[in-house]
Regions:
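Glycine-rich phosphate-binding loops of nucleotide-dependent enzymes
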Residues: 2-249
Length: 249
C-alpha cells in the first residue's frame, strides 16, 4: 500500500470534521473521494499533506482556537503525520488545491519553476518542464503570459503542471473541475487520466460523480466525516439509496 490513513480524526475547536476515518491507496491507482459538501473530503487531503497540522499552529497563534488531529498517515512506510508539510512535499506527496490558485502576478513559466523549487539539478528541471509542456501544450504557448490573465481551464492546467514539476509520487487533487464549463471539465479529466498513465498515483476529490466514476479504479464515499461506502463506480451506482442520498444522482 502506497498510502495508508488509519483512524484519522480532525476537530476544529469542538466541531468534528473527520471521525475515525481510514483509507488506503495502492501505487499507480486513481482513487476518488466523493460525497456531499461539508463531508470532510478537502480536510482529508489537507490532513494527508500536512496542511491541517500547519493550520493548527497558525490558528493557535492568531486566534487561540484549537485544531485537534489524531490517527496516522503513512506514505511508503513512513509516518507523514510526524513531519511538517514541507518535508512531506520532499517525499513526493503533493497537494493540488481547489480553485487552482496560481501566483497571479507571475508568468506561467515562473509558476512552473516555482513548482520545481526542490529540484537542484537544472537538467531535471528542464526535463520536467518539457514533460509538462508535452502534456499541456497550451502552457508552452502561454509561457510568458501573466497567469492571472489565463482562463479558468488554463489555470487548472497550470495548477496540475506546477504540481508535476516536482516529480510527485502521489498527487492529491482537490475538485479540479470546479467552475469550469462542461467541455473544459472533460478536457481536465482527460489530462488527469494521462497523468495517471504516466505512473503517478492520484487521490482525487470531485463533485462530478458521473465522470469520476468512469476513470477511478476505486471510490470512497464520505458523509459527516466518515467513510460510508467504498467500491468501483459500477458497484456504488447499484445502491439506489446511496446514489440518491449521497451522490445526487
Amino acid at each position: 500500500m502506497l498510502l495508508e490513513v488509519a483512524k484519522l480524526k480532525v476537530c476544529y475547536d469542538k466541531a468534528m470534521i473527520l471521525n475515525d476515518l481510514s483509507i488506503g491507496v495502492e501505487r499507480e491507482e486513481l482513487v476518488s473521494l466523493v460525497g456531499p459538501n461539508g463531508a470532510g473530503k478537502s480536510t482529508l487531503l489537507r490532513a494527508i499533506t500536512g496542511l491541517v497540522a500547519w493550520e493548527r499552529e497558525i490558528t493557535r497563534r492568531s486566534t487561540g482556537g484549537d485544531v485537534t488531529i489524531e490517527g496516522t498517515v503513512t506514505f511508503e512506510g513512513e509516518r507523514m503525520d510526524l513531519i511538517p508539510a514541507h518535508e512531506i512535499v520532499k517525499r513526493g506527496l503533493i497537494h493540488c488545491p481547489e480553485r487552482r490558485r496560481p501566483f497571479r502576478e507571475m508568468t506561467v513559466i515562473d509558476n512552473l519553476y516555482a513548482g520545481a523549487y526542490l529540484l537542484i539539478e537544472k537538467k531535471k528541471v528542464q526535463d520536467n518542464l518539457e514533460k509538462v509542456y508535452q502534456l499541456f501544450p497550451v502552457l508552452q504557448k502561454r509561457s510568458n503570459q501573466v497567469s492571472g490573465t489565463l482562463s479558468g481551464g488554463e489555470q487548472q492546467m497550470l495548477a496540475l503542471g506546477r504540481a508535476l514539476m516536482s516529480r510527485p509520487k502521489l498527487m492529491c487533487i482537490d475538485e479540479p473541475s470546479t467552475g469550469l464549463a462542461p467541455i473544459l471539465r472533460k478536457h481536465v479529466f482527460e489530462k488527469i487520466v494521462e497523468i495517471r498513465n504516466l505512473g503517478i498515483t492520484l487521490l482525487l476529490v470531485e463533485q462530478e460523480v458521473s465522470t469520476v466514476f468512469k476513470i477511478a479504479s476505486r471510490n470512497y464515499v464520505l458523509s459527516s466525516g466518515k467513510i460510508i461506502a467504498e467500491g468501483t463506480g459500477e458497484q456504488l451506482l447499484q445502491d439506489e439509496v446511496l446514489r440518491k442520498t449521497y451522490l445526487g444522482l
